[in-house]
């Protein structure tokens, strides 16, 4: 059986892993998943990520906690296969009043909502993280 929405699966694995206080979570790897993991690391929501080069590459994300509590409060899929959400440069949302980030897929690749606003670009809103 094929997976319908691999990005939603990735976000759910992160959410469930932190709820269960796991050190890390593993999932099938893909270029978009690696790009999202890179952004989460740059923004300080995860400790690290690694890709195991095997017959079926696996992405392992090391989760981050602060004083025993998960750093990620909410992680939510916005644009999905059945309903794509596109926003222009002036319509990009501020997650939690600017405390969180929205990951946006633009013509120049994935970037945060802040970076997209600075570059004057809009795109598909992949997810919200706070």
Curated annotation (Swiss-Prot):
GO biological process: translation
Task performed by this protein: One of the primary rRNA binding proteins, it binds directly to 16S rRNA central domain where it helps coordinate assembly of the platform of the 30S subunit.
Entry GO terms, CC: ribonucleoprotein complex; ribosome
Protein name: Small ribosomal subunit protein uS8
Family membership noted in the UniProt record: Belongs to the universal ribosomal protein uS8 family.
Annotated TM spans: none
Subunit record text: Part of the 30S ribosomal subunit. Contacts proteins S5 and S12.
Entries under InterPro entries matching the protein: Ribosomal_uS8 (IPR000630), Ribosomal_uS8_CS (IPR047863), Ribosomal_uS8_sf (IPR035987)
Origin species: Shewanella pealeana (strain ATCC 700345 / ANG-SQ1)
Matches recorded under PANTHER family: 40S RIBOSOMAL PROTEIN S15A
């Amino acid at each position: 059986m094929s997976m319908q929405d691999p990005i939603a699966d990735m976000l759910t694995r992160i959410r469930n892993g932190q709820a269960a206080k796991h050190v890390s979570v593993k999932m099938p790897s893909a270029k978009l998943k690696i790009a999202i993991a890179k952004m989460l690391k740059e923004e300080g929501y995860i400790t690290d990520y690694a890709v195991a080069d095997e017959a079926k590459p696996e992405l392992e994300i090391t989760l981050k906690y602060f004083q025993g509590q998960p750093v990620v409060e909410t992680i939510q899929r916005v644009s999905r296969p059945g309903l794509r959400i596109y926003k222009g440069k002036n319509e990009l949302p501020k997650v939690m009043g600017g405390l969180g980030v929205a990951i946006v897929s633009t013509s120049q690749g994935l970037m945060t909502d802040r970076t997209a606003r600075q570059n004057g670009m809009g795109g598909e809103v992949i997810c919200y993280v706070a």
